[in-house]
């Protein structure tokens, strides 16, 4: 597991492209047959990919977290963006097709991941945050979620937002997690943009062609910067930063947030004339 530290807006004012990428971009999220995780000190979120092939995988981080087992004091969100697979939670095994999700509460002792076909492995994207209360484990299917439809073809930002871990779907301590799909012909996400000082966020972009690129916008509204990202890469968004993106073609992304509250609409909108 890689550790990333926090930064003030003043810290990144003079960062080079390489420095910015080193601090906020995760280039390899899904590694076949392996677990690839990042621990960010922004609200102590752990996120990354679990990509089982021939053998099942289990996240073991007791020493790193100073606990007896991974979810002793944490809650976990999972969404599969790859081939069909399985998740086993304290001995109970469930199938997980593409776009299936799971909320797993604190004090769950074992979570094991496996794939149905090693040649088409499941790709489990996970987000894990500190938790103070144990809530029930809930399997979540995209078919059961009524998407929030937003944007407009004229502004190139028409998209569907599927809220997986959200008060309308399941209980959680502070984790929110969802899946956004852009409509054909749209390129922008989260524009007009916003910040939310009370929550950090992490994005992973996927379902992209090899030569498609995302220009992920970040920074204070009056001093923006960007990361150029390719398929299945992730970005860390501190609470003070905008988080928006535009693609050279279609894409999807998973977002995950944690912080002071679980109010999805608690955000500070940024007027277009404030952007620089």
Swiss-Prot record:
What this protein needs as a cofactor is: Zn(2+)
Cite the entry's keywords alphabetically.
Isomerase, Metal-binding, Zinc
**Metabolic or biological pathway, per its Swiss-Prot or TrEMBL entry:** Glycan metabolism; pectin degradation; 2-dehydro-3-deoxy-D-gluconate from pectin: step 4/5
Which family, according to the similarity comment?
Belongs to the KduI family.
What protein name is recorded for this chain? 4-deoxy-L-threo-5-hexosulose-uronate ketol-isomerase 1
Q: Which GO terms describe its biological process?
A: D-galacturonate catabolic process; D-glucuronate catabolic process; pectin catabolic process
| Cofactor: how and how many bound | Binds 1 zinc ion per subunit.
Name the residues that bind Zn(2+): 194, 196, 201, 243
**Reaction(s) catalysed by this chain's protein:** 5-dehydro-4-deoxy-D-glucuronate = 3-deoxy-D-glycero-2,5-hexodiulosonate
Recorded hits in InterPro entries, A to Z, give:
KduI, KduI/IolB_isomerase, KduI_N, RmlC-like_jellyroll, RmlC_Cupin_sf
Q: Which Pfam families match?
A: KduI
For this chain, one GO molecular function annotation is: 4-deoxy-L-threo-5-hexosulose-uronate ketol-isomerase activity
User: What is its biological role?
Assistant: Catalyzes the isomerization of 5-dehydro-4-deoxy-D-glucuronate to 3-deoxy-D-glycero-2,5-hexodiulosonate.
Q: What is its EC number?
A: 5.3.1.17
């Amino acid at each position: 597991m890689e550790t990333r530290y926090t930064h003030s807006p003043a810290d990144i004012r003079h960062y080079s492209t390489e420095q910015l990428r080193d601090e906020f971009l995760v280039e390899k999220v899904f590694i076949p047959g392996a677990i690839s995780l990042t621990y960010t000190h922004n609200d102590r979120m752990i996120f990354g990919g679990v990509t089982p092939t021939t053998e099942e995988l289990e996240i073991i981080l007791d020493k790193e977290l100073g606990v007896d087992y991974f979810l002793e004091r944490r809650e976990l969100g999972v969404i599969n963006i790859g081939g069909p697979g399985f998740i086993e939670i304290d001995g109970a095994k469930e199938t997980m097709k593409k776009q299936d999700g799971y909320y797993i509460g604190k004090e769950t002792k074992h979570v094991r991941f496996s794939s149905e076909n090693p040649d088409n492995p499941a790709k489990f994207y996970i987000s894990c945050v500190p938790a103070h209360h144990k809530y029930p484990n809930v399997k979540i299917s995209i078919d059961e979620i009524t998407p929030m439809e937003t944007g407009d073809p004229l502004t190139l930002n028409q998209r569907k937002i599927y809220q997986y871990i959200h008060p309308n779907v399941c209980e959680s301590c502070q984790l929110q997690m969802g899946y956004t799909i852009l409509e054909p012909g749209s390129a922008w996400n989260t524009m007009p943009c916003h910040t939310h000082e009370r929550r950090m966020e992490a994005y992973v972009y996927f379902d992209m062609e090899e030569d498609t690129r995302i220009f992920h916008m970040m920074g204070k509204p009056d001093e923006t910067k960007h990361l150029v990202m390719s398929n299945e890469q992730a970005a860390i968004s501190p609470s003070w930063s905008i988080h928006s993106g535009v693609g050279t073609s279609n894409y999807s992304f998973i977002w995950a947030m944690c912080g002071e509250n679980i109010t999805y609409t608690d955000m500070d909108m940024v007027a277009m004339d404030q952007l620089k």
